[in-house]
């Protein structure tokens, strides 16, 4: 049986864009990531040897010349970074996998090491764990996936007024299998036509000629809680470092690392002008969009010149409701994940790998959705909430 991950490009674009910034600005940063399965009753421990075998396959991969040439052709990738990737591989020594001694059936997966050398682990590891689970606990039925995908496409295309609704695939980490992901994308592109704008997956973007999409993830801004000059200024430091790296390119800022209130407090006129838009990834998307529009208008910036990217738990119905609500008031883009890549019948797993430490200091995300925060230091979490004025129910 071939390995699940066949290419180091089989990951999200933002891993490479963040990795490039790390190489140029924080090559010595040390980090720790931790795996968590939020779905109760999932016995991953019985498949730990299979998962471990797949990790061995992942760590044996190198970038091919063809893959490096592809990356070199992306306007925001710098030659020295692509040259570095030519020497790169994921090293198993930074990863620890074991069955939990605390909770029967759970696994413990920790990643510790240089940020530069561990940042590419997360997405393929999640894809591996998903696929190992589903191929052992369910029967693959692509006909169900095809029928459900067709219904979603017809739902959008059957209504007028959605001609400029931009939809992208963001589903690599939660996919049912690589096989389904590979089949899904051409079907989606054919069905949606001009509504389909690309994928976050670099491998499939290369294979099919789609636009690879993505900018930054939570881990990037979280790390600045340890890298920045002081905690209160960590978000500003992260955004300024991004601006230094990309000089106006890749200008979508993530708004929910320490909550929307703190983000808007930091996102001043300078950032409003500099960045192309913002991404929503937790909390009520309608309230979020209204507040973003009000914030832009308060700085005398026309929201119609900025893009609001929605990427939190979307399905086609939610995409259509959001599009109708905000159309004409701003530019819109939608990143759809699990609803596309893991809707074949079995219940998708809620699994994540989150950064929990940087340079020995705890870091955390204070999401706009209760229960999504993840930190191994309750005292730090309390302090972080206090510094950014975030209530304890987040």
Curated annotation (Swiss-Prot):
Listed name of the protein: Nicotinate phosphoribosyltransferase
EC class of the enzyme, as a word: ligase
Encoding gene (name): pncB
Phosphohistidine, modified sites: 218
Post-translational note: Transiently phosphorylated on a His residue during the reaction cycle. Phosphorylation strongly increases the affinity for substrates and increases the rate of nicotinate D-ribonucleotide production. Dephosphorylation regenerates the low-affinity form of the enzyme, leading to product release.
Molecular function via GO: nicotinate phosphoribosyltransferase activity
InterPro entries, sorted: N/Namide_PRibTrfase, NAPRTase_N, Nic_PRibTrfase, Nic_PRibTrfase-Fam, Nicotinate_pribotase-like_C
Its biological purpose: Catalyzes the synthesis of beta-nicotinate D-ribonucleotide from nicotinate and 5-phospho-D-ribose 1-phosphate at the expense of ATP.
GO cellular component, one term: cytosol
Pfam families referenced in this protein's UniProt entry, alphabetically: NAPRTase, NAPRTase_N
Catalytic activity: nicotinate + 5-phospho-alpha-D-ribose 1-diphosphate + ATP + H2O = nicotinate beta-D-ribonucleotide + ADP + phosphate + diphosphate
Pathway field: Cofactor biosynthesis; NAD(+) biosynthesis; nicotinate D-ribonucleotide from nicotinate: step 1/1
Enzyme Commission number(s) from the entry: 6.3.4.21
SUPFAM superfamilies reported for this sequence: Nicotinate/Quinolinate PRTase C-terminal domain-like, Nicotinate/Quinolinate PRTase N-terminal domain-like
Sorted UniProt keywords: Ligase, Phosphoprotein, Pyridine nucleotide biosynthesis
Family, similarity comment: Belongs to the NAPRTase family.
GO biological process, one term: NAD biosynthetic process via the salvage pathway
């Amino acid at each position: 049986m071939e390995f699940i991950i066949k290419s180091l490009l089989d990951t999200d674009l933002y891993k490479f864009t963040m990795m490039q910034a790390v190489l140029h600005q924080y090559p010595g940063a040390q980090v720790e990531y931790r795996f968590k399965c939020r779905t109760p009753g999932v016995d991953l421990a019985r498949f730990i040897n299979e998962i471990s075998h797949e990790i061995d396959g992942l760590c044996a991969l190198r970038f091919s010349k063809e893959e490096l040439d592809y990356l070199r052709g992306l306007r925001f990738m710098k030659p020295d970074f692509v040259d570095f990737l030519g020497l790169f591989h994921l090293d198993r020594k930074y990863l620890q996998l074991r069955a939990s001694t605390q909770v029967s059936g759970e696994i413990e997966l920790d990643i510790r090491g240089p940020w530069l050398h561990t940042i590419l682990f997360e997405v393929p590891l999640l894809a591996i764990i998903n696929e190992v689970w589903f191929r052992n606990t369910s029967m693959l039925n692509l006909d169900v996936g095809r029928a459900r995908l067709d219904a979603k496409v017809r739902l959008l295309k059957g209504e007028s007024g959605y001609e400029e609704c931009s939809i992208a695939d963001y589903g690599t980490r939660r996919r049912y299998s690589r096989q389904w992901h590979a089949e899904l994308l051409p079907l989606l592109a054919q069905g949606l036509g001009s509504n389909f704008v690309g994928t976050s997956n670099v491998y499939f973007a290369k294979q099919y000629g789609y636009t690879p999409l993505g900018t930054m993830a939570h881990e990037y801004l979280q790390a600045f809680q340890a890298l920045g000059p002081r905690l209160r200024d960590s978000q500003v430091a992260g955004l300024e470092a991004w601006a230094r790296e990309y000089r106006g390119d890749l200008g979508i800022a993530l708004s929910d690392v320490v909550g929307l209130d703190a983000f808007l407090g930091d996102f001043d006129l300078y950032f409003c002008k500099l960045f192309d838009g913002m991404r929503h990834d937790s909390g009520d998307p309608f309230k979020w969009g209204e507040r973003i529009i009000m914030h832009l208008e308060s700085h005398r910036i026309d929201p119609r010149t900025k893009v609001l990217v929605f990427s939190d738990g979307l399905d086609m119905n939610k995409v259509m409701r959001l599009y109708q609500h905000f159309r004409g008031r701003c530019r819109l883009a939608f990143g759809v994940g699990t609803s596309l890549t893991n809707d074949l019948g079995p219940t998708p797993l809620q699994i994540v790998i989150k950064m929990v430490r940087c340079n020995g200091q705890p870091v955390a995300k204070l999401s706009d959705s209760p229960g999504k925060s993840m930190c191994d230091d309750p005292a730090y979490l309390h302090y972080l909430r206090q510094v950014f004025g975030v209530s304890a129910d987040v």
